[in-house]
Amino acid sequence: MIEKQNGRLLVSAPLIMANARGLLDAGRSALQRGEVIFDFSAVNEADSSAIAVMLGWLRAAVPAQASVKFAHIPAGVRSLAELYGVTDLLPLA
């Protein structure tokens, strides 16, 4: 689902409702102090649950003293973020 690669956390599982809980938990477990970049370049499918997962990682980053950024967000997820008015909450790498 998520693996460390080249200093980033590469998300490889589809960002869909069926995987949301597993991705949320895997991302939380991977958080560490400092900058953490979630890279979505290997994601080939995503739905609205992706926004919830990303916001969950941002919330979990605070107690972990991590600074989360997102790279290669799928176009559909970006569109949903704009629709929901949360684009400014998703820091880009």
Language model segments and positions:
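STAS-like cytosolic regulatory interaction modules
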Residues: 1-49, 56-93
